[in-house]
A protein has these predicted regions:
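Catalytic cores of the polymerase beta-like nucleotidyltransferase superfamily
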Residues: 1-194
Length: 194
């Protein structure tokens, strides 16, 4: 079961704020410029983000510019891994999934695969390398060949990530365990050396 849920919409932040005001729902403007609004309902927080298209990532962490979109496919295309690029149509009563990158199949096969070119995805945000490793250890999944190759040849991208973020991800990797193979031990060893 998910730790949290990400809600995405074609409504702009201004439209979401207006709907919240009309419905007397408390709002926390967490990331308006990135399209994210947090709604507080019955002591629960729900983050809702406008569909987005990203531009270049010149700092290796965040997009230079975020462009809002009205198309869920644009939003899913910017996700890191296929297993995180699945949407459930909340307006449908039939559990209708939007899964353009076969993330459900990758979950069934226990595979971690990037959306699109793995080198490009990791270059956009070096933290994705650590997230991939964390998912591997947490879920007991394996990497597809291209993702694994991109991880092993792009450790230098971690140089752009703060030590605090690296430490946080690394501790989560250790907590989740699943050191089941020589490859797992090699990944941990490589991380420690980096």
């Amino acid at each position: 079961t998910p730790h949290d849920y990400d809600f995405a919409t074609n409504a702009t932040p201004d439209q979401m704020l207006k709907m919240a005001e009309e419905s007397n729902i408390e709002v926390i403007p967490t990331g308006i410029k990135y399209g994210t609004v947090t709604f507080r309902i019955d002591d629960q927080s729900f983050e809702v983000t406008t569909y987005r298209k990203d531009s270049n990532y010149s700092d290796g962490r965040r997009p230079d510019q975020v462009t809002f979109s009205t198309n869920i496919l644009d939003d899913l295309s910017r996700r890191d891994f296929t297993i995180n690029a699945i949407a459930l149509n909340m307006l449908s009563n039939a559990n209708e999934y939007v899964d353009p990158f076969n993330g459900i199949k990758d979950i069934e096969n226990k595979v971690i695969r990037t959306v699109g070119d793995p080198v490009e995805r990791f270059t956009e945000d070096g933290l994705r390398i650590l997230r991939a490793i964390r998912f591997r250890f947490k879920l007991g999944f394996t990497f597809d060949a291209a993702t694994y190759k991109a991880i092993m040849s792009n450790w230098q991208l971690l140089e752009h990530i703060s030590q605090e973020r690296i430490t946080s991800e690394f501790l989560q990797i250790l907590i989740y365990g699943h050191l089941d193979s020589a490859e797992d031990c090699y990944l941990i060893d490589a991380l420690i050396k980096k």
